[in-house]
From Swiss-Prot:
Keywords: ATP-binding, Kinase, Nucleotide biosynthesis, Nucleotide-binding, Transferase. InterPro entries: P-loop_NTPase (IPR027417), Thymidylate_kin-like_dom (IPR039430), Thymidylate_kin_CS (IPR018095), Thymidylate_kinase (IPR018094). This is Thymidylate kinase. It is an enzyme of class 2 (transferase). It catalyses: dTMP + ATP = dTDP + ADP. One of its GO terms (biological process) is dTDP biosynthetic process. NCBIfam families: DTMP_kinase (TIGR00041). The gene is tmk. One of its GO terms (molecular function) is dTMP kinase activity. Belongs to the thymidylate kinase family. SUPFAM superfamilies: P-loop containing nucleoside triphosphate hydrolases. GO terms for cellular component: cytoplasm; cytosol.
Amino acid sequence: MKNKKPIFVVFEGIDGSGKSTLCKSLTEKLIELGIPSAAFTEPTNLETGKYLRKFLRGEIELGKEEQIEAFLNDREESLKQNILPALNSDKNVLLDRYMYSTAAYQSGDDLSPEMILKKNLNRNFKIPDLLFYLDLSPSIALERLNRRKEGKERFETLAQLEKIRSAYEKILPKDTIRIDGNKNQNQIVQECLEIFLTNIKSKS
């Protein structure tokens, strides 16, 4: 199956909500169906993203403005080197985290999530055609994170997850597709697949 116009899909949610697994699983499902698709993550695996991952692992410290600037720079590279080339080669792009994550995660007393989102929009970053938000209570998300073997990142505490979830609620667009993160993973993938297929039919 080949769609005439590829679409840009973004997955958002707090750590432990299942969005990374969903992004990967849905991409695999689309490829199985013969629908050209590519999955990417932010922070990227580019140099700009590696720098950010050092911060997330607590290996380096960055001030609030430095954090935001680093995320914006990585996003520019993400679009330039990953997202736009894939879309231009007729592949649908599925992205794990985007500008809404930066707005939710980097917000605080000095910078609101709305202000950070505006900084992203002022850069004219591409708006996604579909935005999925996996909603899950912070306590359940933290339980999932605690079961993982890899080391924790700096935002993986109950207080931080609650703050981030609250920030998401302030900046998610009205057309965001909310998915219940408590559902079975296969159910979630199927639900998102049906929404995706309906969307590409309407754009073809």
